[in-house]
A protein has these predicted regions:
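Bacterial N-terminal signal peptides that target proteins for export
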Residues: 1-11
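Conserved serine DD-peptidase/penicillin-binding transpeptidase domain
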Residues: 28-33, 54-93, 140-436, 525, ...
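A short, well-structured edge-of-sheet supersecondary motif
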Residues: 93-117, 348-349
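Boundary at the C-terminal end of the N-terminal hydrophobic targeting segment
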Residues: 23-29, 47-49
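Small-residue-rich helix-loop
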Residues: 100, 114-116, 395-398, 402-560
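Bacterial N-terminal signal peptides
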Residues: 10-19
Length: 560
């Protein structure tokens, strides 16, 4: 299990760690003179000699020896000249990151700056944004906060028949029917809801089962998300009632020949109201999966476009479902039928305050009953916020992250619109003493390319979180090098080093970031290193950038 130092107070080991030892460096300068040949945790003893024989390349070694020309660590304006800072200078000259933006800030809690380069430059954080969202939510709402989903009805019950509608009153729970192990299995959840009907004496519903997502107002997704992302499961938006994280699974396979239509069929959840336009074609062997899905929340229609290579095996794609509340009502409707309870009026959701039964019609029905006017017969609760935050950070779950941000707005300012949520987030920053005047936040997950954070802001937030009463729970939500979802990080380092590096990745096209905490081998809280490393506009694969960032984190770990 990952060792979480006693410096982090109540934090407990929660992540399974992969074992590993020190591995020799792969000195590849002769065949790749533009690359950096790196080994872990050492000094710059041989860099100058290597530069003489291989111009443009630098070898960082951990031989244990010391160059007679090595400059001892000195303090200049709070910054220590050290292996990490020197290496950061070398990295900036390397061809891999040439022309890209590269920024870093790493400080000890006690005040020393270990490494710094362009720390105030605003950059795209990608999923490093989730560190901010989860931390703010845990600090403001508390680690044991839970969402509630309730059942209520309009009308009257007579002789076992509900003369009215049954409402599933959403409370923002993002885990309903989720596959995550922390979530309540959907059939168990439905059995609890059915038990509430039985206890209330309802054996038949004369009206409809209505999925009510009004707890979250405002658009279901952020307008600054890329258009091609909107239909994929990374951009599942939602209101106050969801189902299966608002994911639609679709089985896809190549056609019989190149140019033939791709075969696509919905798998789960069942959404018989949906119509699909299949305008994707079978591509040549080796061209891969280039499918895109374009749905809309206004009608029950989605279009699948792009290509799918003929040599690919069938697979299940995950797309976004724009009708989460309606889907939840429909799934519960079907469950009740298996128990002999029928809803005569079918299913519906609530849009613009009105009951909607036909998803293709722009003419909605009567106004939905006010929640306060319903007779509530029971409710269920979500897992704790700290459990949801753990999955948010480990899985880098965008849907959970967006829900957490909008929950801050709903709980603190009675509105879940993004504008209200930003105000709430700034309130949290103020309570933590974090200056957010130099950043721009446009969502909770990092999917938006309109988010602009700097390493100095991320570091200041992470440092401030160490003073939060909820920090012991927060640190447990952050992954560990070598642990779950980070098995390949710092792979050449010892288990001791990997166990001390708590990190969150951030990745999208051209973006690779890591931020987090590094525990000291020995020492006090003041020796904890807080770091943020950000690269933007890189024209290479993440697999080419990761070894450089891994080495920076390894050098940082060697500093304490």
């Amino acid at each position: 299990m990952g060792r979480i130092n006693s410096l982090f107070a109540s934090a407990a080991a929660v992540l399974a760690m992969a074992s590993g030892g020190l591995a020799p460096a792969q000195a590849n300068q002769r065949t790749n003179p533009g690359n950096l040949a790196l080994t872990s945790g050492g000094n710059l003893a041989s860099a100058q000699a290597n530069q003489r024989t291989h111009p443009g390349s630098y070898a960082l070694t951990s031989s244990g020896g010391h160059s007679t020309e090595q400059t001892p660590a000195v303090r200049e304006g709070g910054r220590r000249q050290n292996r990490t800072q020197e290496y950061v200078g070398l990295v900036s000259q390397n061809d891999i990151l040439k022309g890209s933006q590269f920024s870093i800030l790493a400080v000890k809690v006690g005040g020393d700056t270990i490494a710094s380069r362009n720390p105030d430059t605003r950059m795209l954080p990608a999923s490093n944004m989730k560190l901010i969202t989860t931390g703010a939510a845990i600090h403001a709402l508390g680690p044991d906060f839970r969402y509630s989903t309730r059942l209520g009805y309009s009308g009257q019950i007579k002789d076992g028949v509900l003369d009215g509608d049954l409402y599933i009153i959403g409370g923002g729970d993002p885990t309903i029917a989720s596959k995550d192990s922390m979530a309540v299995p959907r059939f168990f959840l439905f059995s609890q809801w059915a038990g509430m009907l039985e206890k209330a004496g309802i054996r038949e519903i004369g009206g409809r089962i209505i999925g009510d997502g009004r707890y979250f107002d405002g658009p279901i997704e952020k307008d600054s998300w890329a258009y091609h992302d909107i239909g994929c499961s990374d951009a599942c938006g939602g209101d106050g009632l969801c189902f299966y994280e608002n994911i639609q699974e679709v089985k896809v396979s190549a056609g019989s020949s190149v140019g033939a239509p791709v075969c696509a069929a919905p798998v789960f959840p069942t959404t018989p109201w949906m119509r699909y336009g299949i305008n994707a074609r079978t591509g040549k062997a080796g061209t891969g999966d280039n499918l895109y899905y374009f749905p809309t929340e206004y009608v029950a229609y989605g279009e699948i476009v792009g290509s799918y290579a003929i040599d690919l095996k069938p697979r299940t794609e995950t797309f976004s479902n724009k009708f989460g509340a309606y889907t939840c009502a429909y799934q519960f409707f079907n469950y009740l039928k298996t128990k002999g309870i029928e809803a005569k009026g079918g299913v519906a959701d609530v849009r613009m305050g009105r009951i909607r039964t036909d998803l293709d019609s722009q003419e909605y029905g009567s106004y939905a009953a006010k929640v306060d006017d319903l007779t509530v017969i029971g409710g269920t609760q979500s897992p704790t916020l700290k459990e949801i935050a753990l999955m948010t950070n480990l899985k880098s779950d965008n849907f959970y992250a967006e829900t957490l941000l909008r929950t801050l707005g709903r709980r603190m300012h009675h509105s879940a619109t993004y504008d209200s949520s930003y105000v709430a987030l700034n309130d949290v920053f103020k309570s933590l003493g974090v200056d957010a005047s130099g950043v721009q936040i446009r969502d909770g997950s990092g999917l938006s390319r309109h988010n602009y954070l700097s390493p100095s802001f991320i570091v200041s937030f992470l440092k401030a979180m160490m003073g939060s009463p909820a920090f012991g729970d927060y640190i447990q939500t952050i992954g560990v090098a070598g642990g779950a979802h980070y098995e390949s990080r710092l792979a050449s380092e010892s288990t001791d080093v990997r166990n001390r590096v708590h990190l969150k990745s951030g990745s999208m096209n051209g973006v690779r970031c890591y931020s987090g905490y590094i525990e000291p081998r020995d020492g006090t809280k003041e020796d904890v290193i807080v770091f943020s490393i950000m690269t933007n506009n890189a024209l290479v694969r993440a697999s080419q950038v990761d070894p450089i960032l891994d080495r920076i984190m390894a050098f940082l770990a060697s500093e304490n």
